[in-house]
Amino acid sequence: MKSLFKVTLLATTMAVALHAPITFAAEAAKPATAADSKAAFKNDDQKSAYALGASLGRYMENSLKEQEKLGIKLDKDQLIAGVQDAFADKSKLSDQEIEQTLQAFEARVKSSAQAKMEKDAADNEAKGKEYREKFAKEKGVKTSSTGLVYQVVEAGKGEAPKDSDTVVVNYKGTLIDGKEFDNSYTRGEPLSFRLDGVIPGWTEGLKNIKKGGKIKLVIPPELAYGKAGVPGIPPNSTLVFDVELLDVKPAPKADAKPEADAKAADSAKK
């Protein structure tokens, strides 16, 4: 948090310094044309400076929006005034006051983020449980002892994959509200992985079908990404996957040559 916070302040400083008239308008600015760009800058140094300021300004604006989600709304006029005063060497705060204020603000952001994460985690856990219970009542749906809820759409043929096997799948992953977070179909490329190298819900679930099979997995958070979550997947999310098992590649058998060499050595001693 601390390193990010410093980058955020730098973004504000640079954005305002390089482009003083910057405003935080609600509406997006009209895209510049090639003619506008050529007329605005006398040389590459000016253009590069502006590009840096625009990039940092956008980053800072996004950072402020994220803080607003935590209930923290900074006064943008004061933010800009602070930067301008610093460049004019007319700061209204001493270095010590600045340091103390920023430390307190950092603690506030961290506390608010933790509180939001815990609230989101509790809400997602409750909604996920309700979703799983409802899905479990549908025809052909089973619930395992671990809490995995699944529906075999097509069983497939051959042997079911083992932990050490490599599987090739196509899949679509969504949250319980239908929001898609991953899709191999749209990427145009199936995913290949060792079965025991993914989230537990997948490792367990894919053993219920064979090559050519299809399955719907509704995975509780404890078999997915848990309370921590990952980018794109909030904490304590129940995940919904539609998976097609395209191929199963058995793990290579251990090389029998060392054993054969040992037997040959024993024979030679006799």
From Swiss-Prot:
This is FKBP-type peptidyl-prolyl cis-trans isomerase FkpA. Coiled coil: none annotated. Pfam families: FKBP_C (PF00254), FKBP_N (PF01346). It comes from the Bacteria. Keywords: Isomerase, Periplasm, Rotamase, Signal. Its EC number is 5.2.1.8. PPIases accelerate the folding of proteins. It catalyzes the cis-trans isomerization of proline imidic peptide bonds in oligopeptides. It catalyses: [protein]-peptidylproline (omega=180) = [protein]-peptidylproline (omega=0). It is an enzyme of class 5 (isomerase). Belongs to the FKBP-type PPIase family. NCBIfam families: PRK10902.1. It is found in: Periplasm. GO terms for biological process: protein refolding. The keyword GTP-binding does not apply. Residues 1-25 form the signal peptide. The gene is fkpA.
